[in-house]
């Protein structure tokens, strides 16, 4: 793991979990259904990310709400919200605010404790295989709380682990968490294995143009997760998601 990621994990463990909350499972919004609707409307399904680090600062809740509304307006199928505060300058409150836009919301953080799953209501939660957590247990725990797990992988070994669980959504991160380098060929290399298993597949990181977006779709992506490219201007979403 890159030293930057190690530092984030160390800070997260030192910070400890927030107060646990509870919510009815029937309130969960469905990413797969939302992506299917986007396709019917002639759009590439994009999970648009609220990533304060891209602007180098935390965001006021009014700004978070404005991004979420803009993403909904420009056709996002879901919103990803970074909640890690130390490096990515996110917050749990950003999830609550983003959900008011009406789209499925993915909580994106470095989840290493089941207690963290109870911190905020989200529709989906990121589980990173590289953190060496018990994926079976965390997938079951997330579902029990009404959240759909999105299991993130970067290698063949991690893909095998993810496919051995009950996970229905797998994200392939084109960013190497050891070097932080981005390579779209990562998705192209790992996608066939997941396609054979019939899971819903998300391409993460490295999409900066419509050419990149179409390349990931051709390689088998059911949805794309795009962050940095959209923070400078949410209207870019309307250019990236055209089939």
Q: How would you describe each model-predicted region?
A:
Residues 1-59:
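An N-cap/entry alpha-helix motif that binds or orients negatively charged groups
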Residues 8, 48, 71, 120, ...:
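Conserved, mostly hydrophobic/aromatic
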Residues 184, 189-194, 217, 230-243:
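C-terminal helical cap(s) of enzyme catalytic domains, especially alpha/beta-barrels
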Residues 105, 112-123, 154-166, 197-226:
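Catalytic cores of alpha/beta
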Residues 11, 51-53, 84, 110, ...:
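Active-site beta-loop-alpha junctions enriched in small/polar residues
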Residues 77, 81-83, 123-136, 172-179, ...:
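Glycine-rich phosphate-binding active-site loops on the catalytic face of alpha/beta enzymes
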Residues 45, 56-150, 158, 187-193:
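N-terminal active-site wall of soluble small-molecule enzyme domains
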Residues 169-206, 210:
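Glycine/small-residue-rich hydrophobic helix-like segments
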């Amino acid at each position: 793991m890159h030293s930057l990621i190690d530092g984030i994990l160390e800070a997260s463990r030192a910070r400890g979990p927030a107060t646990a909350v509870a919510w009815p499972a029937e309130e969960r919004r469905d990413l797969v259904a939302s992506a299917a609707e986007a396709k019917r409307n002639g759009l590439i399904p994009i999970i648009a990310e609220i990533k304060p680090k891209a602007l180098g600062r935390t965001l006021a809740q009014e700004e978070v709400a404005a991004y979420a509304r803009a993403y909904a307006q420009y056709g996002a199928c879901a919103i990803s919200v970074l909640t890690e505060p130390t490096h990515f300058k996110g917050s749990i409150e950003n999830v609550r605010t983003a959900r008011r836009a009406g789209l499925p919301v993915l909580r994106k953080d470095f989840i290493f404790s089941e207690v963290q799953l109870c911190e905020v209501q989200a529709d989906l939660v990121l589980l990173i295989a590289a953190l060496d957590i018990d994926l079976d247990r965390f997938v079951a725990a997330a579902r029990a709380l009404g959240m759909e797990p999105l299991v993130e992988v970067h290698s063949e070994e991690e893909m095998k682990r993810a496919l051995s669980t009950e996970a229905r959504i797998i994200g392939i991160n084109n960013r190497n968490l050891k070097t932080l380098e981005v390579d779209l060929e990562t998705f192209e290399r790992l996608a066939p294995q997941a396609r054979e298993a019939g899971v819903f597949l998300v391409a993460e990181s490295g999409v900066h143009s419509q050419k990149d977006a179409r390349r990931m779709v051709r390689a088998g992506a059911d949805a794309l997760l795009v962050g940095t490219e959209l923070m400078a201007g949410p209207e870019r979403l309307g250019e990236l998601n055209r089939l």
